[in-house]
A protein has these predicted regions:
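Hydrophobic alpha-helical transmembrane segments of multi-pass membrane transport proteins
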Residues: 23-31, 35, 63, 80-95, ...
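Membrane-interface interhelical linkers
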Residues: 1-27, 57-81, 119-128, 146-150, ...
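C-terminal-most transmembrane helix of multi-pass membrane proteins
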Residues: 3-8, 13, 53, 212, ...
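Hydrophobic transmembrane alpha-helices of multi-pass small-molecule transport proteins
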Residues: 111, 125-144, 161, 257-259, ...
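Hydrophobic/aromatic residues within transmembrane alpha-helices
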Residues: 39, 48, 52, 96, ...
């Protein structure tokens, strides 16, 4: 056996792969979200969400061909719940972006996974890590700037997106025994059925313009198909509490992507925030239970 094969099959690398998959998904999502903004003037929030999820579903169905795998009635119900919250999460977040700033929408939405992490915390160190992540997010995101005069409907949409995000983690964990490609393809298809009526009603035939479809396909691949597939791989092995804390890295990745791709400047406070979020994430990984197997079919997550 070659040295490369030994490294690829090492327990240490196998343990790291779910975390690498999650980080890779967050990087892909950060890049894709920046492209998605270009669709807003063309098809609006509902149309952007419909293109993103609908085209992702087509790509994932073509790649994974989920009908090849057996699907029990219980798993079908779980997939429906997973797809429902996935669709509502995407739609409500884009609806929030119509009237409130991106940073504030992200900050409000992150209350969902961080609350889930708090609920599943059992030790003092767990609560401290969640607190460190929250403090980092508060410094990184413009939570307090321009808070006066915020559109309450936009805030409500962002809060609902946060609730759906927490449920997405819970329901995704319950599908961790399934093939990752099967679960994400069926879930994304269900999400598309939820969103497409809103997108078609708001944008109409503009959704079918060749330039819009091409942009939408790029957004779908980078911001949905790839990251959600990687997240399903990660959810098979990462506990919900650890997953919720690790998601706080996403805005930090977005901020650094903006610095590299858009030449945006980060303040000293924002660099400190990124360091705090990174420390919380490292702590979450180090305190995660070892040797967790994927959940058994029908077992509660």
């Amino acid at each position: 056996m070659s040295s490369l094969s030994l490294h690829l099959n090492s327990p240490r690398l196998s343990a790291a792969l779910p975390y690498l998959a999650l980080v890779g998904g967050m990087v892909s999502l950060a890049v894709g979200t920046s492209f998605a903004k270009g669709l807003f003037p063309l098809v609006g929030a509902e149309g952007t969400a419909a293109l993103r999820v609908g085209l992702s579903a087509l790509v994932l169905m073509a790649i994974w061909r989920p009908w090849r795998f057996r699907l029990t009635r219980a798993d079908a119900g779980r997939v429906l719940l997973y797809g429902l919250v996935l669709g509502l999460m995407n739609l409500s977040f884009y609806m929030a972006l119509r009237t409130i700033p991106l940073g504030l929408a992200i900050a409000i939405e992150f209350a969902g996974p961080l609350t889930l992490a708090l609920i599943h915390s059992r030790k003092v160190v767990h609560f401290l890590l969640v607190g460190l992540a929250v403090s980092g997010l508060a410094m990184l995101l413009p939570i307090w700037s321009g808070i006066e005069g915020l559109d309450p409907v936009g805030v409500a949409y962002a809060a609902f997106a946060g609730l759906c995000w927490a449920l997405y983690i819970v329901f995704g964990k319950r599908l961790s025994h399934m093939h990752a490609g099967q679960s994400v393809a069926l879930g994304m298809s269900t999400a598309a059925l939820v969103i497409l009526p809103f997108g078609a009603s708001a944008a109409g035939l503009a959704l079918l313009a060749p330039a819009v479809l091409l942009m939408g396909l790029g957004v779908a691949l980078v911001s949905s198909a790839l990251p959600y597939s990687l997240e399903m791989i990660a959810l098979r092995h990462i506990p919900k509490r650890t997953f919720g804390v690790l998601l706080s890295v996403e805005p930090a990745i977005g901020a650094m992507a903006g610095m590299v791709l858009l030449h945006e400047q980060l303040s000293s406070l924002q660099w400190l925030a990124i360091g705090g979020i990174g420390a919380a994430s490292i702590g979450a990984v180090l305190t995660a239970p070892r040797g967790q197997a994927p959940a058994e079919p029908g077992a509660p997550a």
